[in-house]
Structure formats: structure tokens, C-alpha cells
């Protein structure tokens, strides 16, 4: 598709910076959500990169998802004249602050490990479950009929 080089460079710069790109499948949308170019230009430029094997494409619920491959990183680096030190955001490690977790206070009384669960576990002095199972001590059993239509009248 014929598009200006300015639009193509804007699309490639955004893709290289983020590493991923999302576009709604709407060819008549005047502007893309993140880039200031027509949505059709974004879809066609990415379709071109997919056909060359530089980008992996997923489609779900009327949205295209494109992921930059290693060959695509090298191609865009050459196209945009970028140094090798600059990498997409998907390849950068995220730093997690260690102080984000709240630490328990040292002076707070704490239960010993397993004390709160001891009531649920079987102990040595626990009840005998197998001995308690069964019909019980009463051996005077009564067998009665069913209820409703299946029950027969007893004659006296």
C-alpha cells in the first residue's frame, strides 16, 4: 500500500519502542489509538512485516496483536538507524522494589507454627473413627416400606 514515509517511520518507531502493537480491526478508523496515523496504514504496515517474518500476529475479538521478533528488531534497527544499545521495552527487565512488602513488627506476639492448625489434625489421643463407624450398639432393627405410592398398607 502506498503511504508516506513519515507515517511508516512513526509506526516503526512505536513498534520498536514498545515491542508490541495493538490495533482494532476497523479500516475506516481515522486515527490509531496510540499513533497519530490512520488505522489502515498501521494494519497494512504490520501486514507487510508479518509477511517478511519480522512480526508475529495474533487476532482476537476484532483486535490485531503484533509481537516483534528478533529478526524484526534487527530490521527496524537498520531501518531507523538505531544503535545496538537501544532495545524494545519487552526485552528490558523490570525492577521490583524490595521495600514494597510490609514487614511484620518484631514486638508483635506471634503464635507458634502449627498451633492454630493443631485442632484440625488427628492427634495421638484422638477419637477412634473406625470403631465409631457402623450400625451402633442397638441391634433392634426395623425395616419399613417406602413412602408415597410404593408404601403398602399394613393390615392389623
UniProtKB/Swiss-Prot annotation:
Pfam families: S10_plectin
Principal place of residence: cytoplasm
Location in the cell: Cytoplasm
Gene3D superfamilies, per the entry: Winged helix-like DNA-binding domain superfamily/Winged helix DNA-binding domain
Intrachain disulfide bonds: none
Biased segments, Basic and acidic residues type: 95-119
Annotated stretches, region: Disordered: 91-156
UniProt keyword annotations, A-Z: Cytoplasm, Ribonucleoprotein, Ribosomal protein
One GO cellular component term: cytosolic small ribosomal subunit
Molecular function terms, GO-annotated: RNA binding; structural constituent of ribosome
PANTHER family for the chain: 40S RIBOSOMAL PROTEIN S10, RIBOSOMAL PROTEIN S10
Protein family per UniProt: Belongs to the eukaryotic ribosomal protein eS10 family.
Protein name: Small ribosomal subunit protein eS10
Provenance organism: Lumbricus rubellus
Gene symbol of the encoding locus: RPS10
